[in-house]
Structure formats: C-alpha cells, structure tokens
C-alpha cells in the first residue's frame, strides 16, 4: 500500500480551500485528512505500507518513508510505484484527499489484484473526474502515467483509457469524492466516522454562513 502525500504546511496544501478557509485552517484540515488516511491504511492487511512524501512527515510505526521524485504529478506517481515495490507485487496507491476511505475499500482493491484471474488494475473514480485509488498487479504498468494530464475533469477517463490501451483488464472501484473545495470538505466530513480527525478539523474551522458554496 502506497500513500502519496504532501507535507501539510500552510500555503502548500489545499490552497483551493482558501477562501473561505485561511491557509492555516486549510493546512490543519489537510493534516487531519492525512492522519485519517494513514490510520486507515495501517488497519488494512498489506505486505508493506509506504508513505511517499513531498516534504517531511512522521510515518506511523512499521511504515517506510520515501521521497517523491519527478516533476509532473504523473512522473511522481510512476516513480512512487517504481521506487516502492519489486516487480510483480500487487500495489495500491491512494492520496490524502479521501479521508472517508475505509479499510474495506482498500482490502477489496488488494484482494482483486491478488486472486488468480482477477484484473490487472483497479481504478477508483473520483466524483470530480479524477481518481482516488490506482492499484496495479505489476507496478511496472505505472509507466503509462507520465503521459496523462492530471488534476483535470478527464484525468480518470484518460487513465482508464491508457491502462486499457496497454492491454490491461481494469476493475472500477466505488466512486468517492475527494477534497478540493470547502463544499467538498463539508460533504466528505459528513461521510467520515464520528472519531474522524478530518471531520473534527472541518467542524472546528467552519467558515461563516454561505461560505461553503464558494
């Protein structure tokens, strides 16, 4: 299991939350999302758990930490797969923007990749047109990623098309909403469990009435 993340420093993360949030509030929300994500991955049965970080962040006990490499997001994604696991090891990568993800989501993705006759890849579509999870039976398949435009409303479709052009059988996972805007933050917080750090952070830093529509 890989988690691709960015150090939650004010001004570097979740800038689309500002306004209505301040940079400090956005960083606290990002830190909570990352903490929830790492907690969930820690609860998911996996041969290894690796935090691939831009910046610095303390990984949970038993995790490995690797730096991100590459310029574009596509390059960093491909390098994360290449750096983290040996060839022919089923690997699932997620980011830090879906703190509502469950261990069940992740375990199901890994199981699909390890059963005989299962798919070559699993892709979790995001509601905004991107994707929240990518799992590969062989991490070498990630070589298709640098050529895909990221952070657009067509990234998910382009990724699916690229995997299929590679000749891969792809299983689609449950769509999830990721956190880009203040409205996303409120919606995702409502989908998180009561003990969620993310939900608590959103509740603690609620903007004024009507601001979530921005």
Regions from the PLM with identified roles:
Residues 52-58:
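Short, polar loop motifs at secondary-structure junctions
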């Amino acid at each position: 299991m890989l988690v691709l993340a960015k150090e939650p420093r004010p001004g570097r993360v979740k800038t689309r939350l500002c306004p209505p949030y301040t940079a400090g509030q956005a960083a606290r929300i990002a830190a909570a999302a990352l903490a929830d994500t790492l907690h969930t991955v820690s609860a998911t049965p996996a041969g290894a758990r690796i935090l691939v970080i831009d910046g610095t962040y303390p990984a949970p006990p038993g995790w490995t930490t690797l730096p991100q490499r590459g310029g574009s997001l596509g390059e960093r994604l491909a390098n994360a797969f290449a750096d983290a696991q040996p060839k022919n090891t089923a690997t699932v990568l997620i980011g830090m923007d879906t703190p509502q993800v469950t261990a069940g989501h992740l375990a199901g993705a890994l199981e699909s990749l390890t059963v005989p006759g299962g798919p070559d890849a699993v892709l979790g579509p995001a509601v905004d047109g991107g994707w929240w999870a990518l799992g590969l039976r062989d991490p070498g398949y990630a070589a298709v990623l640098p050529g895909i435009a990221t952070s657009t409303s067509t990234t998910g479709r382009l990724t699916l098309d690229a995997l299929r052009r590679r000749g891969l059988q792809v299983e689609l996972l449950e769509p999830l909403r990721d956190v880009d805007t203040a409205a996303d933050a409120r919606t995702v917080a409502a989908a998180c469990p009561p003990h969620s750090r993310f939900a608590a952070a959103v509740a603690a830093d609620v903007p004024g009435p009507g601001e979530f529509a921005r």
